[in-house]
Amino acid sequence: KLVSVVDGAGMTQDVIYEGRPDSRTKHSFFWQTKYALDSGVVDVSYRFATDDWEIDSHTIDSRFRFNLGDNNYIQPHLRYYQQSAAEFYRPFLNQNDPMPMYASADYRVGEMTAYTVGLKYGHKMENGHEWAVRAEYYQQDPKNAGFDEPGVLADLDLYPSVKAVILQFNYHF
Protein backbone atom coordinates (compact mmCIF):
# COMPACT_ATOMS: atom_id res chain seq x y z
CA LYS A 1 0.00 0.00 0.00
CA LEU A 2 1.16 3.50 -0.79
CA VAL A 3 0.98 6.93 0.86
CA SER A 4 1.10 10.16 -1.16
CA VAL A 5 3.45 12.95 -0.10
CA VAL A 6 1.87 16.29 -1.08
CA ASP A 7 2.96 19.92 -1.25
CA GLY A 8 1.08 22.95 0.10
CA ALA A 9 -1.15 22.98 -3.01
CA GLY A 10 -2.18 19.36 -2.40
CA MET A 11 -0.25 18.09 -5.42
CA THR A 12 1.50 14.73 -5.11
CA GLN A 13 5.28 15.12 -5.04
CA ASP A 14 6.21 11.57 -4.07
CA VAL A 15 4.69 8.22 -3.20
CA ILE A 16 6.11 6.04 -0.42
CA TYR A 17 5.31 2.58 0.85
CA GLU A 18 3.27 2.50 4.04
CA GLY A 19 4.86 1.35 7.27
CA ARG A 20 3.04 -0.25 10.18
CA PRO A 21 4.28 -1.55 13.52
CA ASP A 22 5.38 -5.21 13.40
CA SER A 23 3.04 -6.24 16.20
CA ARG A 24 -0.40 -5.39 17.50
CA THR A 25 -1.87 -6.13 20.91
CA LYS A 26 -5.67 -6.17 21.13
CA HIS A 27 -8.04 -6.28 24.08
CA SER A 28 -11.80 -6.61 23.95
CA PHE A 29 -14.91 -6.79 26.06
CA PHE A 30 -17.93 -8.71 24.73
CA TRP A 31 -21.46 -8.94 26.11
CA GLN A 32 -24.34 -10.90 24.58
CA THR A 33 -27.91 -11.50 25.62
CA LYS A 34 -30.25 -14.02 24.08
CA TYR A 35 -33.86 -14.00 25.17
CA ALA A 36 -36.36 -16.68 24.20
CA LEU A 37 -39.89 -15.54 23.45
CA ASP A 38 -42.91 -17.60 22.44
CA SER A 39 -42.58 -16.09 18.96
CA GLY A 40 -38.80 -16.44 18.57
CA VAL A 41 -35.42 -15.36 19.94
CA VAL A 42 -33.94 -11.90 20.49
CA ASP A 43 -30.12 -11.76 20.24
CA VAL A 44 -28.30 -8.52 21.13
CA SER A 45 -24.55 -8.09 21.59
CA TYR A 46 -22.01 -5.34 22.25
CA ARG A 47 -18.26 -5.42 21.74
CA PHE A 48 -15.64 -2.87 22.74
CA ALA A 49 -12.16 -3.41 21.35
CA THR A 50 -8.96 -1.46 21.82
CA ASP A 51 -5.38 -1.97 20.71
CA ASP A 52 -1.92 -0.47 20.99
CA TRP A 53 -2.36 1.16 17.58
CA GLU A 54 -4.89 3.45 19.35
CA ILE A 55 -7.87 2.01 17.47
CA ASP A 56 -10.94 1.86 19.70
CA SER A 57 -14.10 0.30 18.29
CA HIS A 58 -17.68 -0.28 19.35
CA THR A 59 -20.05 -2.80 17.75
CA ILE A 60 -23.75 -3.26 18.49
CA ASP A 61 -25.35 -6.25 16.76
CA SER A 62 -29.00 -7.32 17.00
CA ARG A 63 -31.08 -10.09 15.49
CA PHE A 64 -34.66 -11.10 16.13
CA ARG A 65 -35.61 -14.57 14.94
CA PHE A 66 -39.38 -14.51 14.51
CA ASN A 67 -40.97 -17.94 14.07
CA LEU A 68 -43.62 -18.27 11.35
CA GLY A 69 -45.08 -21.55 12.52
CA ASP A 70 -43.03 -24.68 13.22
CA ASN A 71 -40.89 -24.76 10.07
CA ASN A 72 -40.32 -21.17 8.90
CA TYR A 73 -38.78 -18.02 10.33
CA ILE A 74 -37.66 -14.55 9.41
CA GLN A 75 -34.75 -12.81 11.10
CA PRO A 76 -34.13 -9.06 10.78
CA HIS A 77 -30.53 -8.00 11.44
CA LEU A 78 -29.11 -4.60 12.45
CA ARG A 79 -25.44 -3.91 13.14
CA TYR A 80 -23.64 -0.64 13.92
CA TYR A 81 -19.85 -0.26 14.05
CA GLN A 82 -17.67 2.74 14.95
CA GLN A 83 -13.89 2.99 15.19
CA SER A 84 -11.26 5.65 15.83
CA ALA A 85 -8.18 6.02 13.64
CA ALA A 86 -4.84 4.32 14.27
CA GLU A 87 -2.20 6.69 15.61
CA PHE A 88 -0.22 6.31 12.36
CA TYR A 89 -3.17 6.76 9.96
CA ARG A 90 -2.56 9.58 7.47
CA PRO A 91 -4.61 9.99 4.28
CA PHE A 92 -1.50 11.73 2.89
CA LEU A 93 1.78 13.17 4.18
CA ASN A 94 2.84 16.81 3.87
CA GLN A 95 6.31 17.17 2.34
CA ASN A 96 7.15 20.02 4.76
CA ASP A 97 6.51 17.87 7.85
CA PRO A 98 9.03 15.40 9.27
CA MET A 99 8.39 11.89 7.94
CA PRO A 100 6.84 9.71 10.66
CA MET A 101 8.23 6.31 11.61
CA TYR A 102 4.91 4.67 10.63
CA ALA A 103 2.23 5.85 8.21
CA SER A 104 -0.70 4.25 6.41
CA ALA A 105 -3.39 5.75 4.17
CA ASP A 106 -5.44 2.53 4.37
CA TYR A 107 -8.98 3.64 5.22
CA ARG A 108 -9.52 0.42 7.17
CA VAL A 109 -7.28 1.77 9.96
CA GLY A 110 -8.87 5.23 9.74
CA GLU A 111 -11.83 6.67 11.59
CA MET A 112 -15.13 5.25 10.33
CA THR A 113 -18.66 4.15 11.03
CA ALA A 114 -20.46 1.27 9.35
CA TYR A 115 -23.86 -0.34 9.47
CA THR A 116 -25.55 -3.47 8.20
CA VAL A 117 -29.29 -3.92 7.65
CA GLY A 118 -30.63 -7.27 6.55
CA LEU A 119 -33.28 -9.94 6.57
CA LYS A 120 -33.01 -13.74 6.61
CA TYR A 121 -35.73 -16.27 5.76
CA GLY A 122 -35.32 -19.88 6.81
CA HIS A 123 -37.22 -23.15 6.33
CA LYS A 124 -36.78 -26.46 8.17
CA MET A 125 -37.65 -29.44 5.97
CA GLU A 126 -39.32 -32.67 7.07
CA ASN A 127 -36.00 -34.57 6.95
CA GLY A 128 -34.51 -32.15 9.51
CA HIS A 129 -32.38 -30.29 6.99
CA GLU A 130 -32.69 -26.53 6.85
CA TRP A 131 -32.17 -23.95 4.14
CA ALA A 132 -32.11 -20.18 4.44
CA VAL A 133 -31.62 -17.13 2.27
CA ARG A 134 -30.18 -13.88 3.61
CA ALA A 135 -30.05 -10.42 2.01
CA GLU A 136 -28.12 -7.56 3.63
CA TYR A 137 -26.96 -4.06 2.81
CA TYR A 138 -23.62 -2.87 4.23
CA GLN A 139 -22.29 0.68 4.22
CA GLN A 140 -18.94 1.86 5.57
CA ASP A 141 -18.38 5.61 5.97
CA PRO A 142 -14.76 6.68 6.51
CA LYS A 143 -14.33 10.02 8.30
CA ASN A 144 -11.75 12.77 8.36
CA ALA A 145 -9.86 12.24 11.63
CA GLY A 146 -8.90 15.92 11.86
CA PHE A 147 -6.59 16.38 8.87
CA ASP A 148 -6.37 19.72 7.05
CA GLU A 149 -6.70 19.12 3.31
CA PRO A 150 -4.36 21.47 1.43
CA GLY A 151 -5.15 23.01 -1.95
CA VAL A 152 -6.81 20.75 -4.50
CA LEU A 153 -7.37 17.99 -1.91
CA ALA A 154 -10.05 20.17 -0.28
CA ASP A 155 -12.18 19.71 -3.43
CA LEU A 156 -11.84 15.91 -3.53
CA ASP A 157 -13.79 13.24 -1.68
CA LEU A 158 -10.90 11.66 0.22
CA TYR A 159 -13.22 9.50 2.32
CA PRO A 160 -15.73 7.83 -0.04
CA SER A 161 -18.30 5.41 1.34
CA VAL A 162 -17.97 1.69 0.67
CA LYS A 163 -21.27 -0.04 -0.06
CA ALA A 164 -22.12 -3.70 -0.60
CA VAL A 165 -25.16 -5.90 -1.08
CA ILE A 166 -24.86 -9.43 0.28
CA LEU A 167 -27.03 -12.32 -0.87
CA GLN A 168 -26.38 -15.70 0.74
CA PHE A 169 -27.99 -19.13 0.54
CA ASN A 170 -27.36 -21.69 3.33
CA TYR A 171 -28.17 -25.38 3.50
CA HIS A 172 -27.66 -27.30 6.76
CA PHE A 173 -27.88 -31.09 7.04
Language-model features: where?
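Acidic, serine/threonine- and glycine-rich low-complexity intrinsically disordered segments
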Residues: 1-54
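Outer-membrane beta-barrel translocator domains and adjoining extracellular loop/strand segments
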Residues: 1-6, 46, 55-60, 87-93, ...
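Residues that define the transmembrane beta-barrel architecture of outer-membrane proteins
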Residues: 23-29, 56-58, 111-115, 161-165
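Transmembrane beta-strands of outer-membrane beta-barrel pores
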Residues: 25-27, 35-39, 48-52, 80-84, ...
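Outer-envelope beta-barrel architecture signal
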Residues: 27, 38-42, 58, 70-74, ...
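Membrane-embedded beta-strand positions of outer-membrane beta-barrel proteins
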Residues: 44-46, 64, 76-78, 119, ...
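Outer-membrane beta-barrel translocator/channel fold
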Residues: 73-124, 149-151, 156-158
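Outer-membrane beta-barrel "beta-signal"
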Residues: 121, 160-173
